[in-house]
Amino acid sequence: MSGMIENGLQLSDNAKTLHSQMMSKGIGALFTQQELQKQMGIGSLTDLMSIVQELLDKNLIKLVKQNDELKFQGVLESEAQKKATMSAEEALVYSYIEASGREGIWSKTIKARTNLHQHVVLKCLKSLESQRYVKSVKSVKFPTRKIYMLYSLQPSVDITGGPWFTDGELDIEFINSLLTIVWRFISENTFPNGFKNFENGPKKNVFYAPNVKNYSTTQEILEFITAAQVANVELTPSNIRSLCEVLVYDDKLEKVTHDCYRVTLESILQMNQGEGEPEAGNKALEDEEEFSIFNYFKMFPASKHDKEVVYFDEWTI
């Protein structure tokens, strides 16, 4: 007996049943020969291979090699119908593009693997592109190469360069704006009282009590940027970490622990002065200044037990 599956593909009842069972496990599910025999309740390998061959002829199943073992994978009816309309050369070119996934494949690699003439390959690619089966994308690693992938897929980060690239070009303006936003956000945690008190105050490192959280995490930064909608691309904690490491390299941040950063006092002073390092003479005077606890006491938050503390009437630093 024979049956029909959607899109007009003629199949026997056994082939239709096997395909339905394979697709019920989800797109991309792989099956061994033994698993297919068990699903169909077929003891004879010859009978199973007859059904599998029917599905192969209709492009409703394909062979996939996994860990040196040959397995079977079901194909959507719409995808099979698409291949049914292709010429033999187009189907061959399409199969290599499909296998390349989100990494894509270079047009010259297609020619080498298919052993087709350059003119035939270009004709197939043009036809597949016009039908929106495949598309060409730019690679940041190989800008002169024409990379092809399935039309429905999004290129991998290795191809696009991630959020730092726009149309294959490094977006310096976008990166610099994010670096400024990240630094500003972290500085509000490191110096919550603002920066103006450093303009004429002591140019020394600020000390904190152990219970003071004067840093920001990459997750906090990401949540802030996402909520503020300052980026039109999706960022990840790894992207934020990369930005923070750039600021660490520029001595604008220092790493407290894993994925935790705080701004440096030098970056605050540089921003307030509008210039780089202070003059050598002023630096020498700073080094000679005596340390006084009164210049730093505001950085230690009051404790709820302070009222019970007994102080000496007089004490010396």
From Swiss-Prot:
Pfam families: RNA_pol_Rpc34. Keywords: DNA-directed RNA polymerase, Nucleus, Transcription. Its main location: nucleus. The keyword Transcription applies. One of its GO terms (cellular component) is nucleus. InterPro entries: RNA_pol_Rpc34 (IPR007832), RNA_pol_Rpc34-like (IPR016049), WH-like_DNA-bd_sf (IPR036388), WH_DNA-bd_sf (IPR036390). GO terms for biological process: termination of RNA polymerase III transcription; transcription by RNA polymerase III; transcription initiation at RNA polymerase III promoter; tRNA transcription by RNA polymerase III. It is found in: Nucleus. Changing E89A: Cold-sensitive. Abolishes interaction with BRF1/TDS4. The keyword Signal does not apply. Belongs to the eukaryotic RPC34/RPC39 RNA polymerase subunit family. Component of the RNA polymerase III (Pol III) complex consisting of 17 subunits. Interacts with BRF1/TDS4. DNA-dependent RNA polymerase catalyzes the transcription of DNA into RNA using the four ribonucleoside triphosphates as substrates. Specific peripheric component of RNA polymerase III which synthesizes small RNAs, such as 5S rRNA and tRNAs. Involved in recruitment of Pol III to the preinitiation complex. Involved in the configuration of an initiation-competent form of RNA polymerase. This is DNA-directed RNA polymerase III subunit RPC6. It comes from Saccharomyces cerevisiae (strain ATCC 204508 / S288c) (Baker's yeast). The gene is RPC34.
